[in-house]
Amino acid sequence: MKILTLNTGSSSLKFTLYQHKNTQILASGTIEKIKTKKSIIRIKTQNDLLEKIDKHIKSHKEALKQLIKILTNKKLNIINNLNEIQGIGHRIVHGGPNFKNSVILNENILSELEKISALAPLHNPTAIKVIEITLKIFPNAKQVLCFDTSWHQTMNENAFLYATPYSWYKDYNIRKYGFHGLSYAYITKRVATILNKHKKDLNLIILHLGNGSSINAVKKGISYDTSMGLTPLEGLAMGTRSGDIDPAIIPLMSKVLNKTPRKIEEILNKESGMLGISLKSNDLRDIWEGVENNEYNSKLAVEIMAYRIKKYIGSYLAILEFNIDAIVFTAGIGVTDYGIRELSLKGFEKIGIEIDLQKNNLAREKNIESDISSEKSKTKILVIPTNEELTILEDTYNLITEHSRDLK
């Protein structure tokens, strides 16, 4: 069975075409900077044929048309026709309170998804447009929605509720949802294999560190708490997001700057975090260069990021009652930035969590798994590249095959 996974961003479209039988990647790539004159299409085929195409792509609809041309291009030899694709798995950022697992798409599901678009206004409406287009392009393929929030639906009320009026939760669904769930699901499954343990016996602290970052406490193989909240703005100091702040800052700065609350929220999302503190970049590689050049704000940005991470690790150790099997670093920064890993775990050796500095310094490659714990460490410290697409692939395949059995 050939399955296409689609990860729709507000201005991008990431795709992978799999042959499920052996999880072989037939083609993968990204279409970036959609809606601009500097759109870029990057493609990699199973023969490692690389293609880069510069093209003005005005919309996600046009991006999908370009994707179809790529997949059916005889020169690339990926597929002969679109009917070969039997399943499509969509990553959906926000599933709201009702989508606790991945689901096969139908009219009722699509209607329910439209109702919660306000919870993720930058991502869900665009994803819905892509779904509607793929329904027309692939009328015979089963489509599956995989939600980044579903993984965290196992959290208890005392973890996901805010201490706001209870009616806000009951009437308006105001609560912590958490994100990066597809990544956490993959990492948890992978750690179970690495440690040769049943997933239900695992207690983990997983750090998904990228331009958007979060931490997940996993207890008995399921999500117990996470740092992001109703939206991805809560939690750690990130590339451009502030993370945790006093909410009174919003009306205060709205008045001081004579800007609307929505504009202040935009600043907290797009002009804060590492970019806001460093005064130069949201990219930690640029910021580390600033540290080497003794730039005060670059040094401060790194310290703030590591300090926030350390606070969350400490609090999650407490709620897991100091009984954890591993601390896992994943995503772009988590896998490649040895400096952030070292700073974030400094001091934890006093409670048996000790990093091996030499192993840590060598763990910089994007696609390599590493054990960076010292021989003395009572807790494993692992670096594992994430694979959200593989989670989407497995969920899509499993739901389609279950659906086919039910019809027999």
Curated annotation (Swiss-Prot):
UniProt binding sites for Mg(2+): N7, E388
Function field: Catalyzes the formation of acetyl phosphate from acetate and ATP. Can also catalyze the reverse reaction.
Residues involved in ATP binding: K14, H208, L209, G210, N211, G212, D283, L284, R285
Pathway: Metabolic intermediate biosynthesis; acetyl-CoA biosynthesis; acetyl-CoA from acetate: step 1/2
Protein's cellular compartments: Cytoplasm
Co-factor: note: Mg(2+). Can also accept Mn(2+).
HAMAP family: Acetate_kinase
GO CC terms in record: cytoplasm
Catalytic activity: acetate + ATP = acetyl phosphate + ADP
Protein name: Acetate kinase
Classification lineage: Bacteria, Pseudomonadati, Spirochaetota, Spirochaetia, Spirochaetales
Gene assigned in the entry: ackA
Species of provenance: Borrelia hermsii (strain HS1 / DAH)
E.C. code: 2.7.2.1
One Pfam family from the record: Acetate_kinase
InterPro entries: Ac/propionate_kinase, Aliphatic_acid_kin_short-chain, Aliphatic_acid_kinase_CS, ATPase_NBD
